[in-house]
Regions:
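Surface-exposed ligand/attachment interfaces on beta-rich extracellular proteins
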Residues: 49-65, 119-127, 155-157
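A generic structural signal for short, non-catalytic loop/turn and secondary-structure boundary residues
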Residues: 55, 64-67, 90, 103
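Internal mixed-charge
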Residues: 1-10, 27-41, 81-196
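DNA-recognition alpha helix
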Residues: 8-18
Length: 196
């Protein structure tokens, strides 16, 4: 499993900074977090959660869904065939179910998307997105260096322009990869259903 350290190493290789002379870990972690945030919005994790309803109440708290991006569907009651999807609304961390009859305390299954996580022990990124993340983070790191080196004396007068050009090319590639892999660009089968 790839960890934050592994991604940092990939970025250092891309940036030619294997000895950590230009970027410390904290700086790279900030750029990784920024790229991971963008990646998570374009290509979030797809998850389900089972939440217990309160008898007579149509509202469910979404605070237990860590990293929630969007609710895709709500099923109530659960474990029926065909599934009993219901209309719903979300507002300020609350999901309101709209079944014909108020819930009786049974479970509701929520289908949702969430942000990816990456730390020193684990990652939720699928392997095919690790290089996408490294591309974005390296672009942001190079952009920072280009910006900070504009007013500095350098042995090579084109240092800032070189990093800026490289960063722009990598950032363009990153955004194209996000667009290519984004959920909104994939055909997803959907069925119309009569609300329960």
């Amino acid at each position: 499993m790839t960890t934050l350290s592994d991604i940092r190493t990939r970025i250092r290789q891309d940036l030619g900074d294997a000895d950590s002379l230009r970027w410390d870990d904290d700086a790279l972690d900030r750029h990784i977090a920024r790229a991971l945030s963008e990646l998570s919005l374009a290509i979030p994790r797809e998850l389900t959660a089972t939440l217990e309803t309160t008898p007579g109440s149509r509202e469910l708290s979404l605070t237990t869904l860590d990293g929630l991006v969007e609710i895709e569907a709500a099923e109530y009651p659960v474990d029926q065939f065909p599934p009993s999807y219901v209309r719903f609304a979300t507002w300020e961390g609350t999901l309101t179910l709209h079944p014909a009859i108020a819930p009786d305390g049974g479970d509701a299954r929520i289908y949702y998307t969430a942000v990816h996580t990456l730390d020193e022990t684990e990652s939720t990124l699928p392997p095919h997105l690790e290089d996408v993340l490294a591309t974005g983070a390296a672009a942001y790191a190079a952009l920072e260096l280009a910006s900070s080196s504009t007013e500095q004396l350098n042995l090579n007068g084109d240092t800032s322009a070189t990093y800026a050009g490289w960063a722009r090319a990598r950032l363009t590639a990153f955004h194209q990869l996000l667009h290519t892999h984004a959920r909104k660009n994939h055909v997803r089968p959907r069925n119309l259903y009569v609300p329960a």
